[in-house]
């Protein structure tokens, strides 16, 4: 199980990303439309103003049950070993059992 502080930090990053998503998207559109390099630098400075944790690249997918940040399956939102346990216990509908 991941530490509660790490899970909380990840949720905080998700909130920040949602908050600043429109600002980042509009700034990127402006940069692509403007041909002047000096104006692009000004807009790029505006793009750097939101907090670092609001960048979408800083987000991690985490396992819903354990909070583990690695070996996650996007379709299920679970880490590998939890997914395997749930499939063997027939808790995931549509998933077939196999040993790997």
From Swiss-Prot:
GO terms for biological process: translation. GO terms for molecular function: rRNA binding; structural constituent of ribosome. InterPro entries: Ribosomal_uS14 (IPR001209), Ribosomal_uS14_bac/plastid (IPR023036), Ribosomal_uS14_CS (IPR018271). GO terms for cellular component: chloroplast; small ribosomal subunit. Gene3D superfamilies: 1.10.287.1480. It is found in: Plastid, Chloroplast. It comes from the Eukaryota. Keywords: Chloroplast, Plastid, Ribonucleoprotein, Ribosomal protein, RNA-binding, rRNA-binding. Part of the 30S ribosomal subunit. Belongs to the universal ribosomal protein uS14 family. Binds 16S rRNA, required for the assembly of 30S particles. This is Small ribosomal subunit protein uS14c. The lineage of its organism: Eukaryota, Viridiplantae, Streptophyta, Embryophyta, Tracheophyta.
